[in-house]
């Protein structure tokens, strides 16, 4: 039996025994309170105990009236009648809802092309503004040109046209280069222009017309030229007289001998010949001296053309040749007032940029106008111009970077039957299909059929000869053009593809490719029929690389075959730009095989159909 200790009553002993048990509960409750997460402050209402229990009054709440100091310490002006700007979170929620409601196809746009994006964009707002300015010009008569220049345009440059209407790029570039538009910079500074327009739109004429006009205007004001012409005329009068006159003691050369007024730089010798041919047409009516020099000519011919006693007004050359001449004779750039760089996207890239920039620097002291011309504005060219020429005046057309809708693009899947990844077979079959379809229709003369000129583009120059040999083995008239081809031979090859004259051959009695003309309808017993080689007489094929895709005016080409898928949209634009030139229709065919970017081809085709500018 338990007994309480002495000195303590039973009640005190019971309280002492219960005291430690009662102390366990607060510590346990404290530990549980620390384990549970605390309730955030945003979950509890401020002043919840002070909420009135009275029912709310019906009707809108009264607007809070600010006191006399309510406009102090505000970050935004609370102006009545101006809607509040939504927060960033509200804009994100709204944009997400809009994207859900849109159609997926409309929202996607170019996905595969965005991975490359080699072209500098031009806003559609600017394109629309350019369209409005273009409509103001409808004829060459509206340009402030000399009468002789206008006559040369109608009779020499564009004789085959019934209506002489300037193209979009000519409506924009010619007035600007003539000085019709007011320039913000002083006349003493060099004027800088960039002409950018789609392929086959007449860019060459857009810079030749103002340049020739400016040269003739400056020639009329040149005192040295006037004095030379006066002395020359007096010499002719003395020679016509019957009296004997002693010969002149010195034979004074022309003031422009070896010092041209305008220089046109192009990347290849083929373009040198092409631009020179157009200048020669102008020179029949507008009297000026033009010379073309390239590696196709010997040193003696180049020297005679540059330092001709009759002088030189316009020089067409390549950067390599002109740079080497300027090193030995710097005076060749001393009187240059107009410097035109055609195919600027090529001449200002890594390969040509040092030479081209050096020529620009040497000609800058006397230079009045610097004109860059290109069918595309790559990002590399755009960044170069922003650094070197930040104030350049960009003259672009609304359809820049867009392949014309008059050019149709077809796709041949080489992986399927009957080709089975044989691109050579697919290329030959495509050419045979074009030739057979053309042979079914007579040409302008009965019994004759037109010859179809076809360009085949490959990515590697080693492939050109291989594809050409295969096509020849299949009865197709094909030749290869690459850097390995001699330059004289290159000009001969391109002559038949750049000439606008139609070619025709005699139409065979049987269908092209049939065996009835070459094989008897019977074979003697025990003998084997001789092998028969089919031949397609109404086609001419040129297999080339990007050498033939820049600037060559292939007006006679209606079909372009892309043997390899181009590396970028820039190559797409230049290769497909060899057809459908100057408003004509054309057709491009892409051979898509294993490993090719089908998504890129698909988006380019959709962009062509919708008339969009590629990126």
Curated annotation (Swiss-Prot):
Q: Where is this region: Disordered?
A: 21-108
Q: What residues span the transit peptide?
A: 1-37
Annotated GO CC locations: mitochondrion; nucleolus
Chain ranges of the Helicase C-terminal domain: 444-615
- Origin species, per record, is Sclerotinia sclerotiorum (strain ATCC 18683 / 1980 / Ss-1) (White mold)
- E.C. number, please? 3.6.4.13
> What is the recorded name of this protein?
ATP-dependent RNA helicase mrh4, mitochondrial
Catalytically driven reaction(s): ATP + H2O = ADP + phosphate + H(+)
Q: Which cysteines are joined by disulfide bonds?
A: none
Motif DEAD box per UniProt: ranges: 342-345
Question: Compositional bias (Basic and acidic residues) spans?
Answer: 90-108
Q: Which Pfam families match?
A: DEAD, Helicase_C
Q: Which gene encodes it?
A: mrh4
Q: Where is the Helicase ATP-binding domain?
A: 184-395
Physiological role = ATP-binding RNA helicase involved in mitochondrial RNA metabolism. Required for maintenance of mitochondrial DNA.
């Amino acid at each position: 039996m338990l007994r309480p200790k002495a000195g303590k009553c039973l009640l005190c002993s019971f309280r002492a025994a219960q005291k430690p048990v009662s102390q366990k509960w607060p510590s346990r409750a404290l530990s549980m309170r620390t384990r549970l997460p605390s309730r955030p402050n945003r979950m509890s209402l401020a002043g919840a105990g002070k909420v009135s229990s009275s029912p709310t009054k019906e009707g809108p709440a009264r607007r809070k009236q600010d006191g006399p100091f309510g406009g102090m310490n505000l970050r935004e002006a609370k102006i009545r009648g101006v809607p509040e700007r939504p927060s960033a979170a509200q804009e994100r929620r709204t944009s997400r809802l809009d994207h859900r409601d849109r159609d997926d196809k409309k929202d996607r746009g170019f996905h595969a092309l965005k991975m490359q994006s080699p072209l500098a964009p031009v806003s559609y707002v600017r394109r629309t503004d350019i369209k409005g300015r273009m409509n103001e010009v409808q004829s060459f008569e509206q340009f402030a040109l000399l009468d002789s220049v206008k006559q040369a345009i109608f009779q020499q440059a564009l004789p085959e046209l019934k209506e002489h209407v300037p193209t979009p790029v000519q409506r924009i570039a010619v007035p600007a280069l003539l000085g019709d538009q007011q320039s913000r910079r002083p006349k003493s500074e060099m004027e800088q222009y960039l002409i950018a327009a789609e392929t086959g739109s007449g860019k060459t004429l857009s810079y030749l017309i103002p340049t020739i006009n400016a040269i003739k205007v400056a020639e009329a004001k040149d005192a040295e030229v006037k004095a030379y012409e006066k002395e020359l005329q007096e010499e002719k009068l003395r020679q016509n007289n019957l009296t004997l006159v002693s010969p002149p003691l010195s034979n004074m050369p022309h003031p422009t001998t070896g010092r041209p007024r305008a220089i046109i730089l192009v990347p290849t010798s083929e373009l040198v010949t092409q631009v020179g041919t157009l200048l020669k047409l102008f020179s029949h009516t507008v009297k000026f001296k033009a010379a073309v020099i390239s590696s196709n000519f010997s040193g003696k011919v180049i020297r005679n053309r540059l330092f001709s006693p009759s002088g030189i007004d316009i020089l067409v050359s390549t950067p390599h040749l002109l740079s080497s001449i300027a090193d030995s004779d710097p005076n060749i750039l001393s009187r240059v007032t107009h410097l035109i760089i055609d195919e600027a996207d090529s001449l200002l890239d890594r390969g040509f940029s040092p030479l081209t920039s050096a020529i620009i620097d040497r000609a800058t002291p006397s230079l009045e106008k610097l004109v860059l011309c290109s069918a595309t504005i790559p990002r590399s060219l755009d960044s170069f111009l922003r650094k070197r020429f930040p104030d350049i005046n960009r003259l672009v057309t609304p359809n820049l970077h867009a392949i014309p809708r008059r050019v149709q693009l077809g796709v041949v899947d080489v992986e399927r039957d009957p080709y089975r990844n044989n691109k050579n077979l697919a290329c030959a079959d495509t050419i045979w299909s074009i030739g057979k379809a053309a042979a079914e229709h007579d040409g302008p003369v009965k019994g004759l059929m037109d010859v179809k000129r076809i360009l085949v583009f490959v990515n590697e120059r080693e492939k050109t000869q291989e594809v050409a040999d295969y096509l020849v083995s299949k009865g197709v008239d094909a030749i290869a053009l690459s850097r390995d081809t001699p330059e004289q031979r290159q000009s001969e090859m391109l002559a038949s593809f750049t000439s606008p004259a139609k070619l025709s051959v005699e139409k065979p009695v049987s269908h092209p490719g049939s065996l009835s003309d070459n094989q008897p309808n019977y074979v003697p017993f025990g003998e084997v029929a001789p092998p028969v080689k089919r031949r397609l007489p109404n086609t001419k094929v040129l297999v080339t690389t990007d050498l033939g895709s820049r600037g060559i005016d292939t007006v006679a080409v209606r079909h372009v075959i892309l043997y390899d898928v181009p590396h970028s949209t820039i190559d797409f634009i230049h290769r497909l730009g060899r057809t459908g030139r100057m408003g004509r229709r054309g057709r491009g065919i892409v051979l898509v095989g294993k490993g090719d970017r089908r998504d890129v081809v698909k988006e380019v085709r959709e962009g062509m159909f919708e008339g969009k500018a590629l990126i």
